[in-house]
């Protein structure tokens, strides 16, 4: 690991938006290496409390006074240019670096950077691969976009040349990385508040491919038509995977009573080994194939790959079993894009239940608006849909789109759908209507998980 780009280990580094999952991970890596760290966020959280316990100075709220001792400021793409800490940094000539730049510079200190990109599945695949790498004893540094039990959080600092991280395409952040193994799980229309259209997104992924050195590897889902159209841009080793085609394939797929896949792994029409997943759905078969490809490209042993895959039981907020109440199961999932919702509901359909209640909180006004038609078609596997208000995240309500409009379209299509403004009202509705053997599935990238927790903790 090298921090040459920081120049001086005595420097004080301040993070604006330190409570974010990636920012907190970077801060934790620096704390581990004895840097002086501070950070600000709008709200206190378990993440900020954990960083405080590790020695970081945490400020709640953004104020210019927060940066007075900083030598370097790291900020997220969600931070606006009129943020008082950004303004103060510019006035005081304090060096500014966005999160992606900082992470990219950090990656320069490693030889085997594994950057996992794609519209969907990054956190799960990064987590699954982390299990494989730890079983293989490669002692990786890991930065993942979720909490992973095996590393007791979202970051692990290793001593080897292996660095495993997610590579998010939002605002082309991943183009600042230095992948030795670049992974593309899928390409779909998303972040249309930044990208013009799907072609613009594909162009960004095409540039990502070109970052991989000639002796490196592109691992890609070969059955994704959007990936197929850009894979020719690769000037490196290419490994494709899929169900029906690709260098690495899953054959003889069977699902157990919890919708988890068991299958044989084939390479060039020769069976390598069999795997039994402990996470549900076809999408996780594909995620596991990506992890297997990376393991094989990294010369990891088959037994370590198998043990790593089979020891993975999921990450927090990814088809996470929250508990049972009166024989009613509550599961939470981070899905917030129509494709992800469809995959989650498809997995849930195979899960044992009588009636499925899907409690969905749309995430951001821009995504709800630009993908509105797709949102009206992704809930068909749910028996009943409950919609919360849109979670604004980094955006402001312009009055153009709201959750009731989505509910109206779903009802027009003949789906049973009810809108609520308050989580308490959703909880009370579930108390009255969910029966023995039913499944409650909370879905969304905001705070909709709280509904499931409220229900469980009655």
Curated annotation (Swiss-Prot):
Its annotated pathway reads: Cell wall biogenesis; peptidoglycan biosynthesis
In short, the EC number is 6.3.2.8
- EC class (word): ligase
Q: Name one Pfam family in it.
A: Mur_ligase
Q: Name one GO molecular function term.
A: UDP-N-acetylmuramate-L-alanine ligase activity
Gene Ontology biological-process annotations: cell division; cell wall organization; peptidoglycan biosynthetic process; regulation of cell shape
Q: What is its main location?
A: cytoplasm
* Compartmental location: Cytoplasm
Q: Which InterPro entries match?
A: Mur-like_cat_sf, Mur_ligase_C, Mur_ligase_C_dom_sf, Mur_ligase_cen, Mur_ligase_N, MurCDEF_pg_biosynth, UDP-N-AcMur_Ala_ligase_MurC
Query: Domain of life of the organism in this record?
Result: Bacteria
User: Which reactions appear under catalytic activity for this entry?
Assistant: UDP-N-acetyl-alpha-D-muramate + L-alanine + ATP = UDP-N-acetyl-alpha-D-muramoyl-L-alanine + ADP + phosphate + H(+)
What residues bind ATP, as annotated? 118-124
**Which keywords are on file for this protein?**
ATP-binding, Cell cycle, Cell division, Cell shape, Cell wall biogenesis/degradation, Cytoplasm, Ligase, Nucleotide-binding, Peptidoglycan synthesis
Entry GO CC? cytoplasm
PANTHER family to which the protein is assigned, alphabetical = UDP-N-ACETYLMURAMATE--L-ALANINE LIGASE, UDP-N-ACETYLMURAMATE--L-ALANINE LIGASE-RELATED
Q: What does this protein do?
A: Cell wall formation.
Of which family is this protein a member?
Answer: Belongs to the MurCDEF family.
What's this protein's name?
Answer: UDP-N-acetylmuramate--L-alanine ligase
What species is this protein from? Clostridium botulinum (strain Loch Maree / Type A3)
| Gene name for this UniProt entry | murC
């Amino acid at each position: 690991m090298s921090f040459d780009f920081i120049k001086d280990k005595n420097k004080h580094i301040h993070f604006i938006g330190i409570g974010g999952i990636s920012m907190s991970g970077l801060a934790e890596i620096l704390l581990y290496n004895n840097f002086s760290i501070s950070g600000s966020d709008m709200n206190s959280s378990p993440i900020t409390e954990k960083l405080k316990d590790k020695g970081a100075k945490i400020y709640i709220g953004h104020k210019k006074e927060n940066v007075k001792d900083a030598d370097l400021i790291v900020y997220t793409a969600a931070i606006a240019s009129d943020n008082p800490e950004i303004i103060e940094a510019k006035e005081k000539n304090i060096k500014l670096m966005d999160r992606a730049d900082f992470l990219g510079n950090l990656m320069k200190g490693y030889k085997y950077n594994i950057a996992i990109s794609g519209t969907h599945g990054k956190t799960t695949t990064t987590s699954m691969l982390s299990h494989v790498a730890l079983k293989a004893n490669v002692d990786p540094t890991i930065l993942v976009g979720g909490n992973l039990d095996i590393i007791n959080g979202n970051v692990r600092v290793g001593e080897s040349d292996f660095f495993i991280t997610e590579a998010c395409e939002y605002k082309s952040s991943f183009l600042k990385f230095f992948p030795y193994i670049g992974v593309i799980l899928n390409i779909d229309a998303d972040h249309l508040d930044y990208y013009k259209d799907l072609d613009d997104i594909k162009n960004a992924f095409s540039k990502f491919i070109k970052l991989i050195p000639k002796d490196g590897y592109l691992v890609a889902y070969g059955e994704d038509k959007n990936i197929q159209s850009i894979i020719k841009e690769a000037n490196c080793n290419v490994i494709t995977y899929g169900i029906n085609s690709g260098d690495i394939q899953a054959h003889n797929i069977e699902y157990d009573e919890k919708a988890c896949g068991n299958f044989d792994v084939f390479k060039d029409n020769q069976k390598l080994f069999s795997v039994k997943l402990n996470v549900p759905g076809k999408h996780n078969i594909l995620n596991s194939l990506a992890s297997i490809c990376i393991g094989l490209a990294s010369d990891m042993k088959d037994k370590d790959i198998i043990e790593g895959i089979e020891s993975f039981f999921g990450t927090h907020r990814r088809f996470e079993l929250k508990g049972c109440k009166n024989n009613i199961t509550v599961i939470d999932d981070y899905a917030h894009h129509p494709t992800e919702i469809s995959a989650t509901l498809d997995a849930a359909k195979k899960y044992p239940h009588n009636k499925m209640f899907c409690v969905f909180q749309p995430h951001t006004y821009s995504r709800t608006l630009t993908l509105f038609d797709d949102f009206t078609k992704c809930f068909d596997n749910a028996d009943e849909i409950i919609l919360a208000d849109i979670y604004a995240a980094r955006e402001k309500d312009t009055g153009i789109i709201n959750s009731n409009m989505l509910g109206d379209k779903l009802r027009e299509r003949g789906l049973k759908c009810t809108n609520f403004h308050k989580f308490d009202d959703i909880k009370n509705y579930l108390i009255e209507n969910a029966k023995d053997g039913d499944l409650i599935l909370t879905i969304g990238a905001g705070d909709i998980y709280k509904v499931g927790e409220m229900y469980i903790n009655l």
